[in-house]
Amino acid sequence: VHTCEEFDFSKSPYWPDPESMIRKLHEKDIRLVLWQIPVYKKQGMDERVCRQLELDRENAVRKAFCVRKEDGSPYRIPEGNWFAGSMIPDFTNPETKKDWFGKRQYLLDMGVDGFKTDGGEFIYESDLLFSGGMTGAEAKNNYAQTYTGAYTQFLKEENVLFSRAGFAGAHRTPIHWGGDQQSENGELYSVLQAGLSAAMTGIPFWSFDIAGFAGPLPSPDLYRRATQLACFVPVMQWHSEPDGGQFKELMPGMDGNNERSPWNIAKAWNCPAFTDEMRFWHRLRMNLLPYLYSTALQCCREYRPMMRPLVYDWQQDPEAVRAEDEYMLGDSLLAAPLLQENQRIRSLWLPEGSWYGLFSHKKYEGGRR
């Protein structure tokens, strides 16, 4: 017997005691963030029918919890798009939010620390209707913020939101990450531009997937340079598409081996010393945490992003205006990442002032290359 109220782990053989598991994670200073997607999912032909999910979909239609078409029927994500055939919750409807988050309240109660709010770009048609009066044309950009804003209202102050999509006001729903990239050399420059663009919109905390999310496993060279870049952005993470995931046709990876962990890269490329090399950068990151923490607090108080293109702080400096591949992380660290394949050295612009090499401790006077 299933009811629309049965949304918990109680009957799952995979998670017999999630509350105890979360408590043990917290004892090790590990926080748990759960992935979310704003859909009433249409199951695939290869999935076992979930009666609980079907009940939830039927309930959403009956009570008008989902976005509608002009004729009043539920809008479904068009074929050829992610989660095709799924319906979308209408977060402008107070009853939708009450139902949606009522089914997730127990997650916060048991200690879940936040949510990774993926998706948010599912409005592909203009003639759609929302409870709050918004049309599909207006919602194509705004839905992402309606969605993440609803989650922000649901969370406690100590919880975190980790989002991909956004619109005007996205700075109020941190953290954000740059979405899914392929493991290709050209992507590293692009992802840096995405981070600096996000900073200029006021987003304070930003991240990306080290060396890409999908496609063939990155080379040690790409992974090394991506890790070095990630060490000096607000949030450092590696992440990868699961085997047989959504990009298996568009960006095929290595069969059964998509994991982007440092040790898997070392194993796949037969370079055992690579793990220790990456450990150096991860330890450096941990040693930077006091600086990053104080910088994050400062940015919240002063409404400034942590990661800033040089032009943000040196607006009258023509060289700073032209610098597309350097940035500040807080007030004291200037990062100039290696973005080209097999690159080991590069030139950079130092703004006015005295600068010190992080590793060499050598002093450099600014206002020159």
Role assignments for model-derived ranges:
Residues 1-369:
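Catalytic-domain carbohydrate-binding cleft regions of carbohydrate-active enzymes
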